[in-house]
Amino acid sequence: MTGPPAVTHVGVTVTDLDLAIRWYGDVLGFEPIGPAVEVRAGAGHGGAVAADVFGPRFGRFRQAHLAGANGVAIELFEFVEPPSDWRAGIFHICLAVGDVEAVAGRIAATGGRRRTLRVWPIFRDEPYLTCYCEDAFGNVIELYSHSHERTWANRS
């Protein structure tokens, strides 16, 4: 590898896939890449791969891929059998949104909530802002005012 890898997607477990697709689209502007699919253990290549990934307890899940502005996607999972993922999940996803306060307000107004009481500067006296929220399903979303590279470049 000659440089850092590109982030391609973040997997997020939700309890209602259809609602999550609408929520991530309406609130944050993500767009479905294709239709939602159902994957069953032992059903075709996808079922074989999923059974290998999730182990013998896996039965089936529903899945959707949502496109973001910079090519990084969100991969939504609704585990049906068993009804939730039995492994530890991600801590958070981070989205560069520009107007952190406005997006945090939209999240809180549509079934999510703010975890931090305010929008914080990441560094004192600099324009890079952050706020932690939760989506309508309890997953942590960190909001950035700028890209990760711009925020963290040239730090000692």
PLM features: residue spans?
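A short acidic/small-residue loop/turn micro-motif
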Residues: 40, 81, 147-150
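Short secondary-structure boundary micro-motifs
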Residues: 48-51, 79, 114-118
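Short secondary-structure boundary/capping segments
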Residues: 2, 54-56, 65-66, 84-85, ...
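Core segments of cupin and vicinal oxygen chelate
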Residues: 13-70, 102
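Residue-level detector of anion-binding/catalytic polar loops
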Residues: 31, 73, 113
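Short, glycine/acidic-enriched loop or turn micro-motifs at the edges of active sites
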Residues: 19, 78, 145
